[in-house]
């Protein structure tokens, strides 16, 4: 897990693939927040289609590559959790802080990948 976390941290822009509510594949740039308690945490906004898509079908994949063309692809189930500790931790990222200002922002959501595995 530590090697995966290090790779995600070194390559901050990942791509999150979901199945949209229209049944079509969707792929969006995303950013890994951090690992806590063995979970890979990400965040999003509950007004976005990606949030609604993951609620409807939580099976997702995250893909990321390095400038040297090394890459990983992780499959897992997106699990949303009202976890204030994680929300506060996400605020350490200036991009997240700039978008949401505080961990108490009502549109701010965090999720982790349940049973992530490489594919």
Residue map of PLM features:
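Charged, amphipathic alpha-helical segments
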Residues: 1-2, 44-47, 95-96
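A short, Trp-centered hydrophobic/proline-enriched beta-strand micro-motif
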Residues: 6-21, 60-64
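Acidic-histidine catalytic/liganding microenvironments
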Residues: 11, 57, 93
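General beta-strand recognition
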Residues: 15, 40-41, 119
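Charged, gly/pro-rich active-site loop segments
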Residues: 73-119
């Amino acid at each position: 897990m530590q090697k995966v976390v290090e790779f995600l941290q070194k390559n901050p822009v990942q791509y999150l693939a979901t199945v949209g509510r229209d049944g079509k594949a969707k792929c969006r740039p995303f950013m890994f927040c951090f690992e806590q308690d063995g979970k890979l945490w990400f965040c999003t906004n509950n007004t976005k289609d990606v949030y609604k898509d993951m609620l409807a079908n939580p099976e997702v994949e995250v893909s990321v590559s390095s400038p040297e063309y090394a890459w990983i692809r992780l499959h897992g189930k997106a699990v949303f959790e009202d976890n204030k500790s994680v929300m506060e931790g996400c605020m350490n990222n200036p991009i997240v802080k700039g978008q949401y200002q505080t961990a108490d922002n009502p549109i701010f959501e965090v999720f982790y990948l349940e049973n992530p595995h490489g594919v």
